[in-house]
Amino acid sequence: MIIKPRIRGFICVTAHPAGCKANVEKQIEYVTAQGAITSGPKKVLVIGASTGYGLAARISAAFGCNADTLGVFFERAGEENKPATAGWYNSAAFEELATAKGLYANSINGDAYSDAVKQKTIETIRQDLGQVDLVVYSLAAPRRTHPKTGEVFNSTLKPIGKPLTTRGLNTDKETITDVSLEPASAEEIEGTVAVMGGEDWQMWIDALLEAGVLAEGAKTTAFTYLGEKITHDIYWNGSIGEAKKDLDKRVLTIRDTLAAHGNGDARVSVLKAVVTQASSAIPVMPLYLSLLFKVMKEKGTHEGCIEQVYGLFKDSLYNAAPIVDETGRLRADYKELQPEVQDEVSALWPTVTNENLNQLTDFVGYKKEFMHLFGFGLEGVDYDADVNPDVKIKNLVQM
């Protein structure tokens, strides 16, 4: 079939296999050009491995550290006349390219929150890798079924304490709008923490440790975002922020557990705002990112997922002098938070109108990166060609 982009709200409901492969290849080329991280991990588990920061971590591990990788994700396969999700095509491309390099690259497709997927992951590590020395936790999901109680929790993006009206960008209509959000209820906050907090990360590490498949001295990291004033009401001070604060609490227990296991370590890693399927759903983010791109590109400091994560591996995760803050978090977001960047974004924020949107912001760049997530708009791809949407992932365990 000929696959074209079909956008509904903040999501593109189609994805292009050749375009997704080109996007993965582009990220691999970047990592390869940077050179090897000699002290890096050798056997890596990435939970949430198919898109965004999780995919970038898998690429950085394989092509930056020559590591064997096992990826866990929840994606939909393609059919004869229906495209797969972008994450499916990304993972198929990654596996093909990593295998061609002589690396182990297997995947498990299923609900990472479930005990069954944890058990299958443990079996696979035991059988194929023996042990893993790095666990990257990069899940973003709208809901979670608790594996012990069966209770279903939903995650929400809402302010806390009072209603919020803020500027936003309607990406469909390309207009500046006011976005009003009611505050989250106690139940919604609890649900968001249950989905996006640190409990599942802790469950993964406990299960891997108990099964004996975590190498001595193993490291683990989960990703977070702090941001600055513009995003604080909806993000850090909102329902999602409560979940991220839960990560900060739970990492202390995980760190102690791993420290006792051959001097291992656990860190929350703070990454910059980027265009991902998750971030495009956050009301202020498209406008904030469009402004941030403009300012950071002018300063020559713009970075996407792969630049951020490769930098995190090289400068912090596998560096004797990591970039850490006073709470012990690893920081890769410092270029975004430079006062001159934030001051400029804050000054431009209230002045953007429908008329000057493309002059004051890099909305064009935002749209381009958004389309790239789904494999569209990449150079060298023939989008008028007939392609088979049913791409197989060879080394896949389907749960």
Curated annotation (Swiss-Prot):
Coiled coil: none
Reactions catalysed: a 2,3-saturated acyl-[ACP] + NAD(+) = a (2E)-enoyl-[ACP] + NADH + H(+)
Amino acids binding NAD(+): 48-53, 74-75, 111-112, 139-140, 244, 274-276
The keyword Chloroplast is assigned to this record: no
Entry annotation: catalytic residues: Y235
Source species, domain of life: Bacteria
Role this protein plays: Involved in the final reduction of the elongation cycle of fatty acid synthesis (FAS II). Catalyzes the reduction of a carbon-carbon double bond in an enoyl moiety that is covalently linked to an acyl carrier protein (ACP).
Homology family: Belongs to the TER reductase family.
HAMAP family: FabV_reductase
NCBIfam families: EnoyACPredFabV, PRK13656.1
Protein's recorded name: Enoyl-[acyl-carrier-protein] reductase [NADH]
Organism from which the protein derives: Erwinia tasmaniensis (strain DSM 17950 / CFBP 7177 / CIP 109463 / NCPPB 4357 / Et1/99)
